[in-house]
Amino acid sequence: MGGLGALGVSTTAYGFSAPVLRLRVARYNISPPKWPAGLQLRIAAIADLHACDPWMSLDRIQEIVARTNALKPDVIVMLGDYVAGHRQVTRYIPASEWAGVLAGLTAPLGVHAVLGNHDWWEDKTVQREGQGPTIAGRALEAVGIPVYENDAKRLSKDGHPFWLAGLGDKLAYMPARRFRPLRRIGVDDLGATLAKVTDDAPVILMAHEPDVARRVPSRVALQLSGHTHGGQVRMLGWSPISPSGQQLAYGHIKMNCDVVVSGGLGCSIMPFRLGVPPEIVLVTLGAPRPAVA
């Protein structure tokens, strides 16, 4: 069985490696309503690493770190799902190892993170006990990367303040068929998160699942999300399979606030991508030019 498993991974690698391992930068230039004049903010976002060999190796993560730093963003956000959930792997990379590589990310206003559903789902202790912290969250905090769970922090650039907020994951707990019944599904609290914003400076919201955008008020300037992988298959602007629906499958969407959904970097279910290569997102806020995908 071990030999057959290795053969299966090898065959999959042969067929799917090119689109899975390609890496691009998706750039968006956005001017939200009421964005402060004179504040131009460059945000690099990475999402859905799903760290594992051979698809998202430590060398691959190091490449992503180097490419992200080379963009010279003002701030870096990480949008969850660092942990792999699919089974076509030769090794699940321990959290301490991938977090150690992510510690190389650097930006003047820091590196900030939220967790995704797989960071919760693959932590069996958390699922059994019904509470965190997760292994993934502890690993990030250990290397100096703050993990936001319904929290907000006031930052400033060029004398202009803004808020960076992070939502707890809305799908943190798996269905009871795998673990003991829980009375809650998520750890998200949008109201409590926004209540921590204490002035009228603009708000940027990190939320792993984009679905929350339907409830996010116009008080928020920008929501940044991952989770969907752009469907992993995307043709002519359409994703046949998207856990958050077609409207929120990928890209820049105008709702109550501007929403950018990353296509992510890793894979879920199967190591396969078509029409939506792995990407780092770079959002420039306060730039008058139109968005470029």
Question: Locations of the language-model features?
Answer:
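N-terminal export signals
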Residues: 1-17
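Active-site-proximal beta-strand elements of phosphoester/diester hydrolases
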Residues: 40-53, 161-171, 204-207, 258-264
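Active-site metal-binding loops of divalent metal-dependent hydrolases
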Residues: 47-51, 80-82, 117-120, 151-152, ...
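Aromatic-capped interface at the extracytoplasmic side
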Residues: 12-28
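Binuclear metal-dependent hydrolase catalytic cores centered on His/Asp/Glu-rich metal-binding motifs
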Residues: 123-145, 157-203, 213, 273
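Conserved beta-sheet core of the metallophosphoesterase superfamily
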Residues: 204, 209-290
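Membrane-embedded segments
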Residues: 36-146
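Beta-strand-turn-beta hairpins that frame and shape the catalytic cleft
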Residues: 31-44, 145-146, 152-166, 254-259
